[in-house]
Amino acid sequence: MIRLRRLFITLFAFVGISSLSAQQNLWQTKGVISPELLDDNSVVIRLYAPEAKSVVLKCDFAPGGNVEMQRGDDGVWEYRSESLASELYCYRFSIDGMADIVDPASTYVIRDVGSLMSYFIVAGERGDLYAPQGVKHGSLSRVWAKMSDGRERRMAVYTPAGYERGKAKYPVLYLLHGMGGDEEAWIATGRVVEIMDNLIAEGKAEPMIVVMPNGCTKHVAAPGYSEEGMFSPYMSGSMDGSFEAMFPAVVEWVDATYRTIAKPEKRAIAGLSMGGFHAMQISKHYPDMFDYVGLFSAAIFRGESGVEMYEKLEERLIRQFDHEPKLYWIAIGSGDFLYDENVEYRALLDKLGCNYTYSESTGGHEWRNWRIYLCEFAQMLFKK
């Protein structure tokens, strides 16, 4: 009987160890290290796929964006980049023409609209702003606020280091996402928490609250965070005036809930693409609400829209600039598909005598630019 019991114990131990070993092999993807950042700032990307016939690396750091990976005798596909500038980079794999997948050897994954991407950060001047550093950290909350349409909407709110333990009041930046995005967009791909922590710690930005509402009126929250069930994000917009119409309720709720300085000179609004359009429309429709406005690669309607909120553009801009904003900042990349619309909009501002600041970068309609714009814009806020 004792021998039989020992046999069962031995068998259970063997099964447990074998199961654990199998799980470890699965988790470790055959010991593949990917991504591997090298001393010269190049990166090696690897994928264990011994049965694959071809693997294409889709990324923003290889010439042309797509590159065929090379298979080793061990079934590991590999690509080594050239030396990379300090930045955040994204990548995915396409195996034998199938749908793209993230790197199974890396847990660093972000979502942009409905696409999942693996990422890494090359350290240095810019990359260090996008990564956690040894500084005092702020807090990030996801909250629900009741809007003027009677529905609750989800928002992400960043509060600076020391907010919870103090009594001080803070200025507020309302930061808006683009088409297909949600309240998570600026957190994941935009790196807003890391950027604000680091800029504030370096004394380059004033301590401030950052509010990121869900600007897609078709949904009240990011996927998986509402009673709407499982839906797939797509490039649906909210450019019908409804988001702008409810925005005073957003500001009112924030002022009632957080220790804010409820004055226009202590409020800023900015956004990317559709969010830039929203920021432009909200700031002109409520001219006494914001003294700082940032348009990042902003979408600009041409001609009549048929939406009352968007009509009388010249008349409302004149009224807005009668009390000139402390900063009206427009930024766009020279390769952005919205570049011409922004040229036309600046020509209109020039014609009306509206004072603004313009910043032009290289590149197109991409997060790489929008992170830079946020870094630059945040450093100019609440200092006049």
For each of these PLM feature ranges, what is it?
Residues 32-36:
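Short beta-strand segments of immunoglobulin-like
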Residues 1-24:
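Bacterial Sec-dependent N-terminal signal peptides
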Residues 27-30:
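Short, solvent-exposed loop/edge segments of extracellular or virion-exposed proteins
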Residues 25, 37-66, 71-384:
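Non-catalytic cap/lid and distal C-terminal segments of serine-dependent acyl enzymes
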